[in-house]
Amino acid sequence: DDLVAPPYDVIDPEDLDRLLPRSPWTAVRLDGPDDTEKAARLLGEWQDEGVLVRDERPAVWLLEEDFTGPDGVPRRRRGIVARVRLDPYGSGAVLPHERTFSGPKEARLRLLRATRTKPSPIFMLHHGTAPSPTGEPALQAELDGVVSRLWRIGDPAEAERALAGAEGPLLIADGHH
């Protein structure tokens, strides 16, 4: 619970005051700072100290989130956390968000260049169905009333089955600007 953070673009100064003391390893320390060189140094320290490690084997992660919508109705969304191939812009594989702003895009590009990574995922939508997870989640966290659970799928055949439900192009929904 102490490591997760909301998307960087909704974090205000009060959120920072609440999130930063929770852990020296909270995600907001990498994804939120205006000082991209500091974020790059911190990322390097976390990697050197073994706080953040690369998974040795490829995996797909199933994500399930329980939350209450703005209408007061409890909801559950399921998704897949995976990398996607970069295709040429305009190929139709990934559909752009309807509107972005140059300031946030430039800030994200500075962070990407400084850290050589994208600290938070890009949220995309697709037609199809995410598989229902089974067993106990590998990770579970709660932040601001949203309970998030992750299941790791390391078996290549299982990962292929999990990805088979994603049909057609991906639509960028958030995390891109």
Describe the residue ranges of each PLM region.
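A cross-family signal for N-terminal binding/gating loops and helix N-caps
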Residues: 1-177
